[in-house]
Design a protein with these regions (language model features):
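Arg/Lys-rich, positively charged N-terminal/basic patches that mediate binding to nucleic acids
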Residues: 1-27
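Enriched for short, Lys/Arg-rich terminal
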Residues: 2, 51-56, 60-85
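Generic alpha-helical hydrophobic packing signal
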Residues: 4, 27, 32, 71-73
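Short histidine-centered beta-strand/loop micro-motifs
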Residues: 13-15, 40-42, 60
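Generic cytosolic/nucleocytoplasmic N-terminal low-complexity/intrinsically disordered segments
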Residues: 22, 45, 74-76
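A short, surface-exposed loop/turn module that caps and links secondary-structure elements
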Residues: 26-51
């Protein structure tokens, strides 16, 4: 399994100066072993999410690749929207 962090997620973390490197690394290692480990989004088998330090990350599974494609603050109405192709 390969895990890809989308550029928009990287820029979101950098802009808000959110240090998650150690926790995100452990989550990525868990995703490589069991990609279906976290909760589904809207009953879609391949769209899932996890939360670290008040930031909700969404990812989807596409073949042998896991793409962390969006994120938002848990207690905020603002969201980062990404088109899925």
């Amino acid at each position: 399994m390969r895990v890809v962090v989308d550029e928009i997620v990287f820029l979101f973390l950098k802009e808000y100066k959110i240090p998650l490197s150690n926790k995100l690394e452990s989550i990525i290692e868990n995703l490589k072993m069991n990609p279906h480990m976290y909760a589904m989004i809207a009953d879609k088998e391949n769209a899932r999410h996890f939360i670290i330090n008040g930031v909700d990350f969404g990812y989807f599974i596409e073949g042998d690749t896991i793409v962390i494609s969006n994120c938002k603050f848990v207690k905020s109405k603002w969201r980062l929207r990404v088109k899925w192709e």
